[in-house]
């Protein structure tokens, strides 16, 4: 369960707080650290960081994979302080793994970033509707782009000719996970309406 991915969650939090560990603007999906069945942008980010850590943040080794060695090193100190807090609270930390369970992490993010839950409005434009009727666009090359529902760790307003909202550091969500994790937050309403074509009253269940 989520307890088994505590270290990865702590590392994800450190990656959010720190600077981008990649040298240039890469699309995570095409990163050498992305795997076919990944559901979260954090999966290639964590693998890249583990590689940098094992390479002792060596500039040449990191640069070969577009990793910013200094930014990756900074993440280490944030990560250590977060794991120290977890240990003091008596939480048992798993061994950090590059092949951790995406589903258990997704469920943790659902609780932590509930306000950044979104649904895709269009596959072609990556337009999304966030909780609270906000609109935004999923970052290109996200590992969560195949899913209709997702949760983002970052939602940023980018000033330009128009203000655009960019949804990034995203994780795919499946409806059963949503119901399992957020059952206390969700309400199911039964709505009756008259269907003109079929000339009868239809009752629908809507989950909000």
Spans of model-derived segments:
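Second RecA-like catalytic domain
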Residues: 1-207
